[in-house]
A protein has these predicted regions:
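Phosphodiester-processing cores and adjacent nucleic acid-binding clamps
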Residues: 1-261
């Protein structure tokens, strides 16, 4: 339920160019959710980049349920970034990932290796390139390997941690997190239509009233059977309120002099 609430608020209340929610709101609805430290744009990684004090790092780590490290190619763009003076080589990126691993050990937080997947297969990067170019990104042609890596690829990528630690972050911990997550549907199985009192009754009365105006006091059997069949389908599926809303809108528009087609 909290996840649905956050998704709704991110789109309806806090939307600004993209869905988002303040951290304070996140905290209000945290129950039942697992929060990871995210990619290089996450606050933990950014704090490490600017060599934040240990106290601040500890506070940030404490907030998360698990910490994330990602393939070097995901963050290789920082090596050539003139605004960044912390990362100058592949070795610097390795050291950042190792720091996160050490923090996980120090604060007893599971560390998981994630791909930051933006597309399924390597060849699909062309679609992200097109989208980024259309949004004005000057570096759209420099695509990071943000596809879904295989287990073997991830183990090879994180071999610098040692085989035992690589298996822990790639396989063991990721499965632990996955096992903690229940299966949910992104769309709730219930319909949640708006509520207007007595919609079912009112729709039935309006339909039969109109039918009697057209066919007289006694309805032909074929008309009555068809009317009951249609109404039963609408009402039993919870859609009566939709028809009532449409009727009210059309009636109000006509009343105000606007033709509705």
């Amino acid at each position: 339920i909290n996840l649905y609430k956050l998704v709704s608020q991110s789109h309806l209340k806090y939307y600004r160019r993209r869905p988002r929610v303040p951290k304070s709101v996140f905290l209000e609805h945290r129950d039942g959710l697992l929060i990871g430290s995210a990619c290089e744009a996450g606050e933990l990684y950014q704090a490490l980049l600017r060599n934040a004090p240990e106290q601040e790092i500890a506070r940030l780590v404490d907030f998360y349920d698990y910490l994330e490290i990602q393939p070097l190619g995901n963050n290789a763009f920082m090596i050539a970034d003139e605004k960044n003076d912390t990362v100058n080589s592949k070795e610097d990126l390795i050291e950042l990932n190792k720091k996160i691993v050490r923090l996980g050990e120090q604060f007893q937080k599971p560390v998981v290796a994630t791909c930051d997947v933006h597309f399924m297969d390597p060849q699909d990067e062309i679609y992200r390139r097109i989208i980024m170019a259309g949004n004005g990104f000057s570096d759209a042609d420099n695509q990071a390997p943000l596809y879904l890596w295989t287990t073997e690829e991830m183990l090879e990528e994180f071999a610098y941690l040692g085989s035992e630690k690589a298996e822990e972050v790639v396989i063991t911990n990721t499965n632990k997190i996955a096992d903690m997550i229940e299966k949910i549907s992104p769309i709730h199985p219930d319909k949640f239509p708006p509520v207007i009192e007595n919609s079912d009754r009112d729709l039935k009365e309006m339909c039969f009233q109109k039918a009697h105006e057209i066919y007289g006091e006694k309805l032909p059997q074929i008309v009555e059977e068809r009317l009951n069949k249609e109404l039963n389908s609408i009402i039993s599926n919870g859609y009566a309120v939709m028809y009532i809303i449409a009727q009210k809108l059309v009636h109000k528009s006509n009343e105000d002099g606007y033709l509705v087609g």
